[in-house]
Amino acid sequence: HTGGELHEFLLVWSLLTVALLYVPGSLVSGLLYIGMITWYAGVYRTGSWHTVQHPWLYLPMLAVVIPAYVRELRRNGSSTGFFWFNAIAAISIAIGSQLFWFDGHLEVALGIMGLAVAFCLVPLTYRSRTVRTGAWPFLGGIAVLGVLFFLSYHDIWTEIKREPGDHLGPDIWPLITMLAIGIVTYVLALRWRKPMQATWFPESLVIVLVAYGLAYVSIPVATVIINAWLLALGLHTVITGLHLDSLPRMNLGLAIISVTIALRFFDLDINDALKGVVFIALGIGFLFMNMRLLKQRKMATHA
């Protein structure tokens, strides 16, 4: 009874799968359902390049899975299955949230940052540390860094000067929604987390909003703020990694600093040999810091 389009087929099967979320209510049916509605939303949005179609049905279909998610959280919050449930849900929301823009704007980065910060703070909404929610901050952290690196280029900010203030049109609504999600989540998280406690990733939303406001006055100032924040974020991550004796976290901080420096060197018209020297120096820095942490571990073991 469908018209033969793929998105119609996926919609029908998604609706047929809804009952399996609660009878018998298996975890596999939840994973299948989330995957189906995400596929449907993507196909519906990209099915035509001539007309813009937004997958509005994706939103109520996503809401249907919330009771099943809460049930699995209470029953199997520390299980591997729930980890994958979280991972698929996070990926679905990350993809689905980007299907409601009419056009590409600088402000899209602000919306992505808002949602990314909310992802980073998801683990704080659970009192139990045994709940496996690692997929949310992982994806959120990637998105935060992606937006910061994107905004670290001077030319990106010139769109503010080219376009009038009302150029967003209908895109203002998904922008406001995603920003509101990030701001509300950040404010609610203050009950359990002080500003800049443990990680500085959530504060990136504040920095980006400040830089966006200042860009209307001075684009170079906005660019400097983003680059300075990237270096500070990387340095803090390195220090935290050393303090916690964590190689992955320390290397993440080194990577943030190195990528920021490398990107700025690509902006400069300098000799390729000098660029090569810089990359070698960055590699030596990675090696030195890793050897330092390993030595620190060895000394702690013999102490």
Predicted features and spans:
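Alpha-helical multi-pass membrane segments and their bilayer interfacial helix-loop junctions
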Residues: 1-303
